Amino acid sequence: ISKEKKKKEYLSKIYKESRISTKSRLTIIEVKRHLKDLENMIPSILSKMHESKGDVFRILGGRESIMFLIDHSKKEEILKLIPKDELIKTIENIGELIIHFSEKYGDMPGIVGPIINELGINNINIIQTMGGMPSFDIVINQKDISKCHDILLRLFYGER
């Protein structure tokens, strides 16, 4: 068996043992990457989040800006904590796909590429990706959640 085929079979095994979950009704709040302002902003935002209630809070860092991914229901409350001159934009109707890989495989190279490729081939606009083993999150438009989920079900489990 060729090396390529072995890797494909191994990836298939990893995908079959993975779980896919989704989250909808999210909002992105993008702010300027001014570390001094963020130093004050982040603790006050965190104080409004309740992990026990399942509140979503992710920080996505970039070179020029920082994005907060939050539940839409928290949007107004969080915006009050952000100085107007620090706010770049908000994006509503965001969805998230969370892929939970089996930890027994470690951090295998090439595990994410086929997923991104398959979504791209199927015309899915990926806003952001984040995470690392054992979890990989894909941020997309909420309207694409169902289509993405179906694509990943086919890729992972061969379901039609």
Question: Which stretches of residues belong to each language-model region?
Answer:
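A conserved regulatory-domain signal marking ACT and ACT-like small-molecule sensing domains
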Residues: 1-160
